[in-house]
Amino acid sequence: MATENGAVELGIQSLSTDEASKGAASEESLAAEKDPAPPDPEKGPGPSDTKQDPDPSTPKKDANTPAPEKGDVVPAQPSAGGSQGPAGEGGQVEAPAEGSAGKPAALPQQTATAEASEKKPEAEKGPSGHQDPGEPTVGKKVAEGQAAARRGSPAFLHSPSCPAIIASTEKLPAQKPLSEASELIFEGVPATPGPTEPGPAKAEGGVDLLAESQKEAGEKAPGQADQAKVQGDTSRGIEFQAVPSERPRPEVGQALCLPAREEDCFQILDDCPPPPAPFPHRIVELRTGNVSSEFSMNSKEALGGGKFGAVCTCTEKSTGLKLAAKVIKKQTPKDKEMVMLEIEVMNQLNHRNLIQLYAAIETPHEIVLFMEYIEGGELFERIVDEDYHLTEVDTMVFVRQICDGILFMHKMRVLHLDLKPENILCVNTTGHLVKIIDFGLARRYNPNEKLKVNFGTPEFLSPEVVNYDQISDKTDMWSLGVITYMLLSGLSPFLGDDDTETLNNVLSGNWYFDEETFEAVSDEAKDFVSNLIVKEQGARMSAAQCLAHPWLNNLAEKAKRCNRRLKSQILLKKYLMKRRWKKNFIAVSAANRFKKISSSGALMALGV
């Protein structure tokens, strides 16, 4: 609305300042839109037609007309020969200056003042070149078009959780333009085809307000126009969203928008580090005490047993913590020596895939080791369950965790020397998390010193143990290869009718991939096993090399393709029914072994 002193409100210039002409302003504007003929001179002073006056005099500045401030854009005056169409569509409009005599000054159309430029940079031209207060309908549509132009939501993104949508809905502070942001981060979002959103409304005359607004904004802020050009560039199928670095990224939404990550598939398979023990790692020392005063023993809930004693559950009275108690009988001084060695080894093993020691108490007749309680049971007992669907990817998850635990042991210069399926427990009855237990036969390892042992379980013994040769960290890797073979096939590669035949099979390296059983097993899995069950220690893979093997990598991609159930699940069930390792730790006389295997060392099969 134009005031009496000529000031312009809302950035729109009024062409008439006379009080008498205000009443006819709306009628003239509507008539100008419908009929481009020049106004009737009898109605009073008004704008002159450029066709009738092709050589207007130089416009004179009015004292009351505010001069454009620095930074405002003043359009150049078009020449008479360049005028096209009626007034308001490229021609000049003249109006008498209030309080001045002589010929009225020619005012450039749509010349905004500094105040109007700051308030309304998106002001649009109507079809007649001006907006009169008598046209509320057109003004309302212009305001709606300006609001739509400011929103400018991308057309290709429709997911409410997509980070680009989140960014577009969060308006930036008006007092801090985009060009003043300290740093911009462009987030790439795949442009997926979808239904096109309706564009902003158009004003009368078919002028696209959004296009005009972007054009005017580009003239005022070239930097913003360049950024808008980058935003709209979808030539490569990627739309970029400019986001100030001060606002944190919505990482959760981004994970929903992007393709599934590898760890997402791990979560489905419970392939994440097992939960730590319910107590922090501690350095345990053997002490004398009264077990019943500190712990409530539950001997009826047996977890296992062997030659040295039994394992049951217990509860610490002061904290209510449930633990596993390994009771070892002190029959000879060597029994205590072996327990002290086990405590020393476990004090160094602080890893999620290795069982943790809580306390050790000595009584007159026995030693009790209190350890982390693992409720899932043995790995093989778990996978033979009829409700469990075993796939090769499941085996990869199990083997990878075993390799993680072995790698940590070997870094700490510890050899387990009794890796077998019953010494691998599941953390729970539903997931894929496992831990290695039973360090009763573990030994400290120094590569510069020779170490020989003559104990173990025949099926999982390496040739160097059977021959009583020097062992190394590769001795554990042989056992890992046998375990992997059994998980994939359900068969034991060296198992014979008796222990003697089993040990002969180990020494001769007499094993192969059963064609029918391994039909559905990948070549990568076979290669993994073939590089572990090798007679020469130096030719076997280390734990680090196993973790880098292709078979134990790219699990997410393999999980998408793997939907076949392994036959080993059925064969393992038959195997466990035939042979229970818990009751088959047999002490073997060296003299009986020498008769058939021609070995230079004695062999004993011990277990706890």
Swiss-Prot record:
Modified residues (N-acetylalanine): 2
Compartment annotation: Cytoplasm
Active site: 418 (proton acceptor)
Any Gene Ontology CC annotation: cytoplasm
Domain Protein kinase: 297-552
Compositionally biased intervals (Basic and acidic residues): 31-43, 50-63, 116-127
Binding sites annotated in the UniProt record for ATP: 303-311, 326
GO biological process, one term: regulation of muscle filament sliding
Region (Calmodulin-binding): 586-598
Record's compositionally biased regions (Gly residues): 82-91
Keywords on record: Acetylation, ATP-binding, Calmodulin-binding, Cytoplasm, Kinase, Nucleotide-binding, Phosphoprotein, Serine/threonine-protein kinase, Transferase
Disordered: annotated segments: 1-160, 214-235
Domain of life the protein comes from: Eukaryota
EC number assigned by the record: 2.7.11.18
Record-listed Phosphoserine modification sites: 153, 159, 161
Enzyme class of the recorded protein, top EC level: transferase
Reactions the enzyme catalyzes: L-seryl-[myosin light chain] + ATP = O-phospho-L-seryl-[myosin light chain] + ADP + H(+); L-threonyl-[myosin light chain] + ATP = O-phospho-L-threonyl-[myosin light chain] + ADP + H(+)
A GO molecular function held by the record: calcium/calmodulin-dependent protein kinase activity
Modified residues (Phosphothreonine): 457
Pfam families: Pkinase (PF00069)
Main location: cytoplasm
Family statement: Belongs to the protein kinase superfamily. CAMK Ser/Thr protein kinase family.
Subunit structure: May interact with centrin.
Function, as annotated: Implicated in the level of global muscle contraction and cardiac function. Phosphorylates a specific serine in the N-terminus of a myosin light chain.
Descriptive protein name: Myosin light chain kinase 2, skeletal/cardiac muscle
Taxonomic path: Eukaryota, Metazoa, Chordata, Craniata, Vertebrata
